Amino acid sequence: MVDSHGLACNACGRCCNSAPTLSLRELFRHRDRFVGALTIGRVPKRRIGECWRAGHHGHALDADDVAACDALAERLLHRTGDAEREWIALTLQGYDYPSLGRCAALADDGRCSVHADKPSICGAVPLDPMLPDRLQSRVLAARRDDAAWLGADCIVETASARSFVESSFPVPLVTAGQVVDRAALDASRDALAFERAVWRDAVFASLIGGGQDVRHALSRLAPGGYLTVSIVPVLFAVASVSAHCRALSIGFIDAQRALIGMNIEAALARRHADDRPATRELRGFAQALERARHALAAMPTPAAEQTRHDAPRIEAWLDGRRDGDTLAA
């Protein structure tokens, strides 16, 4: 198993074939470009000796692998509390028509139109922030196969002298099993960890306390499966932090409703039958957002003593202020 890989990216845009996952901070920043949705995923607990698969590659997990998976899950995920001791992953996902086969941020020339301010996951890829560092070389081996299938050939084994891509010598990603430059990987994980206090813990508590129907729906998720639902529960959680956070949520709703309307209008003009399920879901999102806006606008302004003690930190984070950059570290 080769444990040293590099990235020889020539900005072809082939891997940008869907909308990214984002932190809420990033989604607020790019609210006019990405429709936000909440994804609820079931992540199985890893076990010693289990054959973990990444693409076509299999690997028998050892005790250190499992310990690393558990440590990362404790930080980023939520326990289901069932006998299997599995995990629930709550993330925010850009939602778009699958038939488009491209990220909404891609320009006509295939270049990223938000490159200078791209989501942290875009800087981390092809590494996977949801998996421990010790498995990243195996992630890259699998994604090397995917990149070759896409015709990109941008992930290379750095044992080779040079990339087959004409553009540049590959930038090292993993050398001898160790992540070389972990800034983007850490930024993505730190954002997930920080936003536990912003919305993820509250949304998870509401799911677990949502009654038997909700718990049954979660239990029916296959390991590795996920649900995509409206982002409204996230916005209610954030709006409860402070009056400023509520105003941010309302502004986000207005931008999202306008964006959804434009996306649906464009889909209707394309007249693709494959777009119909996504159109129905987007209309459902828009209706949920409209109801949420009315509810948030009717909420009384909380008194100063009712504002959360960590509200200034959360406001700085969601505003994208420079002093918020260090909060998640």
What residues fall within each predicted segment?
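Short loop/turn segments that flank or connect secondary-structure elements
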Residues: 1-329
